[in-house]
Design a protein with these regions (language model features):
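Condensing-enzyme catalytic core mediating Claisen C-C bond formation in acyl metabolism
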Residues: 1, 101-173, 177, 181, ...
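Conserved active-site "lid/cap" helical segment
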Residues: 1-25, 149-198, 209-217, 242, ...
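Conserved catalytic cysteine-centered active-site region
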Residues: 1-4, 31-85, 215-242
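Buried hydrophobic positions in well-ordered alpha/beta secondary-structure cores of metabolic enzymes
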Residues: 13, 24-27, 45, 69, ...
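Short acidic capping loops at alpha-helix termini that bridge into adjacent secondary structure
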Residues: 20-26, 53-55, 83-85, 193-199, ...
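Acidic, glycine-rich active-site loops and adjacent beta-strand->loop/helix elements
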Residues: 30-35, 61-64, 89-94, 132-134, ...
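Flexible, glycine-rich active-site loops centered on histidine and acidic residues
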Residues: 78-112
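Catalytic phosphate/nucleotide-handling subdomain of diverse soluble enzymes
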Residues: 241-261, 267-280
């Protein structure tokens, strides 16, 4: 289940941050493939970790979810309400694809990534973010069955309504515009220019979308982290997995300006600008 992948990523993040589970004030799990409708995967993860002092909830913003969660986490920290927040992006989308539908089954993946947010020195950490949604595109990427509108029954199962459906052309058209424009808004809010970006970590959906966003931001591809060829599209897990790999490979240096950018079902989009605070 998704909670197992979330647990493995969370343990690694806590170890790297040198934070115990009991120190966590909040757990946010971004996912569209929760273990079940209720309880939340975050509550299941809280129990697995032994994070008995943490509030816990799931967040459904699809591939934008990790950035949404990161924005929420840092607001709680900046206001002084909480000190340590765990944000996890976790998915098991292999369980939600129709294996006869090449629009989805060869693209979507399982995975999890996590980050622990806490207080950092002045001027570092989250500098700005941009979150957005356009519900008029709700049917562009959807799992129509299994909810209160189309509860599970024989007809919905026969019609694969519990599986992920995607209009690839519409998704591409939306993504190419959204990826670059949301980063530009975050840069503006941070008082920065696109030339100030040291590294872009985009949602790993499609290499052409990533290249298009990089071109719009005038970024050479050597400043853009890409690992889609290894994992495919892991939805909410894609950005934290990429961020962890970029960090572990020594690509993220303290003081550098890092941009995260995602888009997904909803339709949703999100970006944030960080000044990397972690030592090598």
């Amino acid at each position: 289940p998704t909670s197992e992948l979330a647990y493995k990523a969370a343990i690694k993040a806590l170890e790297d941050a040198k934070v115990s589970a009991e120190e966590l004030d909040m757990i946010i799990v971004a996912t569209i493939s929760a273990d079940c409708n209720t309880p939340s995967t975050a509550c299941i993860l809280q129990e697995k970790l032994g994070a008995k002092n943490a509030a816990a909830f799931d967040l459904s913003a699809a591939c934008s979810g990790f950035v949404y969660g990161s924005a929420i986490a840092t607001q709680f920290i900046e206001t002084g309400v909480y000190k340590k927040v765990l944000v996890v992006g976790a998915e098991t989308l292999s369980k939600f694809v129709n294996w006869h539908d090449r629009n989805t089954c060869i693209i979507f993946a399982d995975g999890a990534g996590a980050a622990v947010y806490g207080e950092v020195e002045q001027g570092y950490g989250m500098l700005s973010f941009d979150l957005g949604a356009d519900g008029s595109g709700a049917t562009t990427i959807e799992i129509p069955g299994g909810g209160s509108k189309h509860p599970a029954d024989q007809e919905s199962i026969d019609n694969h309504m519990h599986c992920l459906h995607m209009n690839g052309k519409e998704t591409f058209r939306f993504a190419v515009k959204a990826m670059g424009s949301t980063v530009m808004k975050s840069l503006e809010r941070a008082g920065l220019q696109k030339e100030d970006i040291d590294y872009l970590i985009p949602h790993q959906a499609n290499i052409r979308i990533i290249e298009s966003a990089a071109k719009r931001l005038h970024l050479p591809m050597d400043k853009v982290f890409v690992n889609i060829e290894k994992y495919g599209n892991a939805s909410a897990a894609s950005i934290p997995i990429a961020m962890a790999e970029a960090y572990q490979s020594g690509k993220l240096k303290k003081g550098e300006i890092i941009a995260l950018s995602g888009f997904g079902a909803g339709l949703t989009w999100a970006s944030c600008i960080m000044k990397w605070a972690k030592e090598d």
